[in-house]
Amino acid sequence: MKKMTVCFLVLMMLLTLVIAGCSAEKSSGKSGETELTFWTFNGLHEQFYVEMVKEWNKKYPDRKIKLNTVVYPYGQMHDNLSISLIAGEGVPDIADVELARFSNFLKGSDIPLADLTPLIEKDRDKFVEARLTLYSKNGKLYGLDTHVGTTVMFYNMDVMKKAGVNPDDIKTWDDYHKAGQKVRKVTGKPMGTVETNDSATFLSMISQQNSGYFDKNGKLILNNDTNVKTLQYLKDMINDKTMIPAPGGGHHSEEYYGFMNQGGAASVLMPIWYMGRFIDYMPDLKGKIAIRPLPAWKEGGDRSAGLGGTATVVPKQSKHVELAKEFLAFAKGSEEGNKKLWSVLGFDPLRWDVWSSKELKEKNKYTDYFQNGTGIFSVLLDIKDEINPIYLHEDFAKASDLVNRSVLFDALKSQQKTPKQALDRAAGELKQK
């Protein structure tokens, strides 16, 4: 009975996709326009593409595009995309795929996504290479990211000054630990917070050391020595109260926003795109937050990581593959498009060569909020070559889920397992697939 119910739901979803596909085919724009269907799970991304369609239509008046955007809930969109690719019906022309789900579309040898490598070949040296590697398999690029996700440390300067600690003196994680002890002693507040239901803290810190869940050859390294030692380091800082588990489990929870907005901790490690969360959910910190590189694990070590991400893809089964690819290259591969990624979305663009452009220095809500707001991209330019690639494997989504759901909670929150035990168990589950 359960199997019949599942089959019925899948058939109904397929029928919905077919009907949606037929509707898209029947609807046509003005004479000379080609309609492209775009699926996303983030309504904000639609704003960016609306702007880029306007720019495209100005530049190519004889090849105008009408964008039909469908915004689905996160899980539904990824499920719909998988089913439509299998069925060969109702396939969008372009679609967003979030990092944690991307590996699901790279399985096997017959990858259903168009090769985007030629789109950026001419200017490849202008892109942050780690973010191209992230969405590649066997040397072919299958998605263009929406940002670099340069990971930094956000310091609450009110707390830091009260403790007599200068963030510019923090060069290594040991420096951070020592500074945190002083912050705790003087102010009674933790130096930072650690996510226990999301991997931002842990993954950034192991990526700094050129580690991850898989190596470049697809070998599982989730429980290697680097990862075990890093998780132990976080556990030690929690136990000596230098850091605490993030209220609500992560840095996107209402509990955390309220805690941090009241000056709850001296710092938080997150990608630069987290600026938007400060503005939207922590208004009382305006003018108090300074952005700095991450501490390195040793003097001269890497001071950043590339975190999070949503890549835009072109399914091979799109009815307008070539046009969709050209538009995607224009939107996310051009200098103009990369400047829009900042001005419309507040994201650090994939092309580092626009980071020093005047458009990225103009005052806006981001520059106004942060203490060193007008120098944000000066910080990022200084660390752009210190971002190591994260290698996606077809089991990356499962590995990520295990880390978020079990490893971090068991090792850091409940501490019912040692870091080694938690990572060994997760690695064992992945090997049993």
UniProtKB/Swiss-Prot annotation:
Gene Ontology cellular-component terms listed: plasma membrane
Pfam families with a match to the protein in the record: SBP_bac_1
Lipid-attached positions, N-palmitoyl cysteine: 22
Stretch forming the signal peptide: 1-21
Bilayer topology: Lipid-anchor
Disruption phenotype: Deletion of the gene does not affect growth on glucose and arabinose, but it has a negative effect on the ability of the mutant to grow on the alpha-1,5-arabinose oligomers alpha-1,5-arabinobiose, alpha-1,5-arabinotriose and alpha-1,5-arabinotetraose. AraE/araN double mutant is unable to grow in the presence of alpha-1,5-arabinobiose.
Keyword annotations of the record: Cell membrane, Lipoprotein, Membrane, Palmitate, Signal, Sugar transport, Transport
Positions where lipid (S-diacylglycerol cysteine) attaches: 22
Assembly with partners or alone: The complex is composed of two ATP-binding proteins (MsmX), two transmembrane proteins (AraP and AraQ) and a solute-binding protein (AraN).
Protein name as catalogued: Arabinooligosaccharide-binding protein
